[in-house]
Amino acid sequence: MREKKSIVSGNAHVIVTFNNVYISVTDHQGNVQGWASSGSVGFKGNKKSTAYAAQSVATTLMTKLKRIGLKILNVHLSGSNPIREAALRAIRNSGIVIISLQDMTPVPHNGVRLRRRRRV
């Protein structure tokens, strides 16, 4: 019989792009305990990059992780889209305690040349 896994604290990695929202929760060794994206929750196309999609991704993942005993989170945010505030608000409202919040958005120090601008 399989033993039930149980964790009390973990790390939440919230990755917000302009097209999608991914959240994965790991334990302190880096083993993934649960994940969700706006596509896996059921949104398609342009609806994947809305604040409501980010909120529903966070709430479905937090309810899944509460069942295995998660109570404390370190949150790592990545991405400059304002949608990440909705995901963070949903994590905060789920009842799981956030002890640290880190912004891991990569910022270039004048790296490679940007792509050409799109003309619409």
Curated annotation (Swiss-Prot):
Which keywords does this chain's UniProt record carry?
Answer: Ribonucleoprotein, Ribosomal protein, RNA-binding, rRNA-binding
Q: Which GO terms describe its molecular function?
A: rRNA binding; structural constituent of ribosome
Q: Which InterPro entries match?
A: Ribosomal_uS11, Ribosomal_uS11_bac-type, Ribosomal_uS11_CS, Ribosomal_uS11_sf
Which GO cellular component term is one of those annotated?
ribosome
The UniProt entry's GO biological process terms, in alphabetical order, are:
translation
Transmembrane regions listed in the UniProt entry: none
- Where does the record place a coiled coil? none
Domain of life the protein comes from? Bacteria
Return any one Pfam family short name. Ribosomal_S11
Q: Give the protein's function.
A: Located on the platform of the 30S subunit, it bridges several disparate RNA helices of the 16S rRNA. Forms part of the Shine-Dalgarno cleft in the 70S ribosome.
Q: How does it assemble?
A: Part of the 30S ribosomal subunit. Interacts with proteins S7 and S18. Binds to IF-3.
Family per UniProt? Belongs to the universal ribosomal protein uS11 family.
> What is the name of this protein?
Small ribosomal subunit protein uS11
Q: Which organism is it from?
A: Neorickettsia sennetsu (strain ATCC VR-367 / Miyayama)
UniProt lineage = Bacteria, Pseudomonadati, Pseudomonadota, Alphaproteobacteria, Rickettsiales
